[in-house]
């Protein structure tokens, strides 16, 4: 008798409000803005269809498979408070739609063609629930927070970093000199800027050699383990791996990758190499704002953060919170928890749409970087806690006396904040006072405080939540 050809509404097949989600389903929360005249159920069902088994018309080959087994389902829709004609559509995807251990495949399905769909004005993926049945197919971060602390032999405080500036234009030897001065002054890490790859003024191999020399000299003089994030990002995966192999041969502790511009396939390969060879992996999120900055369209950074934890990285940049609005603080801390913790409860006030259970997947250390300086240290220590990397680029290299004193100032400020916290003092209220006290016995810190004192230090008490 053939089959019933023709176009039918998506909602007849893909909108299933009675569906009970399974523990193995991947769940997605989409912010959907339908075109005028498109009902929300149809829009939500269209998203479920286009990101799973559907196409625009009924096809004969539908009869050769079980759609009920493989289709995505829009199982709940709620209006967004304060927005006209905008909805959160919840979609459940059967686990078998996805290749094991492939973030690339997961994103190709969930945020693929559907984002160009005409029936929608805009579409944003707000959150994903990754079931243990899927996350267990990933290696995840090469080492994780605890193993990193053991490798570095550094406990009970945040780690300190610095991005070498000017980011482009230095020769390899001068670059290595800046690395040495910062590490010698008291930082734990220095960092290649995300766009330092292998340019005519400084080829990657020369940079790696001079930076390794700087690391070993600083280690010998301070008795502390030091690292420099050697950026292995390259134009091909083969070239990227070549750089990572060379870093391992030099014996340095950590390499770096730009995971969005480099791509998830390259990143996952590099993360697996890093675990097999004892390298830590620092991840920069260049290009994230292209994807996550628009409120109505794209993908929230918390989804990119979850994807990175699956693909693999030991550190990832996660914003600074300082000086931003209170609401953003809560949302940032939400995805910081998604990066670090094993089990994260659903909490809509922090932007967490689903309870996420990572089981035993190692955690990722969030990196606070961008426009921060010594006066921010109490706030950063309070907000991010010990398992974080605080990165001061200009806040180190901009010190009036030079790089090493800039590093000293940051280290003194950090140690003062950690000590004050451990003594039970309230960093939120006494932050400025703690920094002032410390600067009395550190001329380097006093000079840094003087330079950046104009920059406002507003840190409202945390108990106003």
UniProtKB/Swiss-Prot annotation:
Coiled coil: none annotated. Pfam families: RuBisCO_large, RuBisCO_large_N. The keyword Disulfide bond applies. The modification N6,N6,N6-trimethyllysine is found at residue 4. It comes from the Eukaryota. The record marks 324 as: Transition state stabilizer. This is Ribulose bisphosphate carboxylase large chain. It comes from Byrsonima crassifolia. The gene is rbcL.
């Amino acid at each position: 008798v053939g089959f019933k050809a023709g176009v039918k509404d998506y909602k007849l097949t893909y909108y299933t409000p009675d569906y009970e989600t399974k523990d193995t389903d991947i769940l997605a929360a989409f912010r959907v803005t339908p075109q005028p005249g498109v009902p929300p159920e149809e829009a939500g069902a269209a998203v479920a269809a286009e990101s799973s088994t559907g196409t625009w018309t009924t096809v004969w080959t539908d009869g050769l498979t079980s759609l009920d087994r493989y289709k995505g389902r829009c199982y709940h829709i709620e209006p967004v408070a304060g927005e006209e004609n905008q909805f959160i559509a919840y979609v459940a995807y059967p686990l078998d739609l996805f290749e094991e251990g492939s973030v690339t495949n997961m994103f190709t399905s969930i945020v693929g063609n559907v984002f160009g769909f005409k029936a929608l004005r805009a579409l944003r993926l707000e959150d994903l629930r990754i079931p243990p049945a899927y996350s267990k197919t990933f290696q995840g971060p090469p080492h994780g927070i605890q193993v990193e602390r053991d490798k570095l032999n550094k406990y009970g405080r945040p780690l300190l970093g610095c991005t070498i500036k000017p980011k482009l234009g230095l020769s390899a030897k001068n670059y290595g000199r800046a690395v040495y001065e910062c590490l010698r002054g008291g930082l734990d890490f220095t960092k290649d800027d995300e766009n330092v790859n292998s340019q005519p003024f400084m080829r990657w191999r020369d940079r790696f050699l001079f930076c390794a020399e700087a690391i070993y000299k600083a280690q010998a003089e301070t008795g502390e383990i030091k690292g420099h994030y050697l950026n292995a990002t390259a134009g091909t995966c083969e070239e990227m791996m070549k750089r990572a192999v060379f870093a391992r041969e030099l014996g340095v502790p950590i390499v770096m990758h730009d995971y969005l511009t480099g791509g998830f396939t390259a990143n996952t390969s590099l993360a697996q190499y890093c675990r097999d060879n004892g390298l830590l992996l620092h991840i920069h999120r260049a290009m994230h704002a292209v994807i996550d900055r628009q409120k109505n369209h794209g993908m929230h950074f918390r989804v990119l953060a979850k994807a990175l934890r699956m693909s693999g990285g030991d550190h990832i940049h996660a914003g600074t919170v300082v000086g931003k609005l209170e609401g953003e603080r809560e949302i940032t801390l939400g995805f910081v928890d998604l990066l670090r913790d094993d089990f994260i409860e659903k909490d809509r006030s922090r932007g967490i749409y689903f309870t996420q259970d990572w089981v035993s997947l190692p955690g990722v250390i969030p990196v606070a970087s961008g426009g921060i300086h010594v006066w921010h240290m109490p706030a950063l220590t309070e907000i991010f806690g010990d398992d974080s990397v605080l990165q001061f680029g200009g806040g180190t290299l901009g010190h009036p006396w030079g790089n090493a004193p800039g590093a000293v100032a940051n280290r003194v400020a950090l140690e003062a904040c950690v000590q004050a916290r451990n003594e039970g003092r309230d960093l939120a209220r006494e932050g400025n006072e703690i920094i002032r006290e410390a600067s009395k016995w550190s001329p380097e810190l006093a000079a840094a405080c003087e330079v950046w004192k104009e920059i406002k230090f507003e840190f409202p008490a945390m108990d106003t939540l």
